[in-house]
Regions:
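Surface-exposed helix-capping loop/turn segments at secondary-structure junctions
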Residues: 49-53, 141-149
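Active-site-proximal alpha-helix that buttresses catalytic centers in soluble enzyme cores
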Residues: 5, 13-76
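Short active-site segment of divalent metal-dependent hydrolases/proteases
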Residues: 15, 157-158
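Short basic (Lys/Arg) and small-residue
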Residues: 154
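Acidic, low-complexity terminal tails and accessory targeting/binding regions
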Residues: 1-6, 76-79, 87-99, 142-147, ...
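Active-site signature of alpha/beta-hydrolase-fold catalytic machinery across serine-
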Residues: 69, 160-164
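Phosphate-handling substructures
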Residues: 72-132, 187, 195
């Protein structure tokens, strides 16, 4: 049987200020809400039976805090990978969708017209994030043949990883749901085949 690397891909827990108003946090180091911290403790029980060999996490607190909780429970030390952080959105950081549509209507329109390549002033494009995240994932996969690893990252980052796994275009970014503290499972086989076992679980 072809050896595989299994990645358990997690989105961080609920953040402070989460609610019905959608907001771009990006590189802003937003903390976890009380519910978000509880979500990690619930998740660690779900993962208890998985033979996790390594744990990699974004450097932002909403991921790194949870990685410490999960790592302590699973017996692995989190490795911080700054390249796994969320897409930087420059001058949009911290603003709600409604605020952006009001304050930057032209930028909002331009991004919707080309979601893959448009770069907010001071920020990154989806393609930029793909170019910094996927080499890290490829390295993790190669390093852990025959093992299972845990990756704690962000909604946008996870969507890019999942789209890459199924060979879908980056323009389909928002066709994949990623709720707080959700679990995705991807098997990477040495022959190049990839199987997505779970999405947003």
């Amino acid at each position: 049987m072809t050896p595989k690397t299994r990645i358990h891909l997690i989105r961080h827990g609920e953040v402070e200020g989460a609610g019905p108003v959608r907001r771009y946090n990006g590189h802003t180091d937003v903390g976890l809400s009380e519910r978000g911290r509880r979500q990690y403790h619930t998740l660690k029980e779900r993962l208890a039976a998985a033979p996790i060999a390594a744990l990699y996490t974004s450097d932002l607190t909403r991921c790194a805090w949870g990685a410490e909780v999960l790592g302590s429970h699973l017996g692995v030390t989190p490795v911080i990978i700054p390249e796994l952080r969320e897409m930087g959105v420059g001058i949009w950081e911290g603003k709600s969708w409604d605020e952006l549509m009001e304050q930057y209507p032209d930028q909002w329109r331009d991004r919707l017209a080309d979601i893959v390549n448009y770069r907010v002033p001071g920020g990154e494009s989806v393609l930029d994030v793909h170019r910094r995240v996927m080499p890290v994932i490829d390295e993790i996969v190669a390093r852990h043949r025959g093992e299972e690893v845990l990756v704690v990252a962000h909604g946008g980052v996870n969507r890019i990883i999942l789209l890459n796994a199924i060979g879908a275009p980056l323009s389909s970014l928002f066709a994949i749901e990623q709720t707080y503290c959700c679990l995705n499972i991807i098997d990477y086989f040495a022959d190049g085949n990839t199987v997505v076992k779970l999405v947003n679980g």
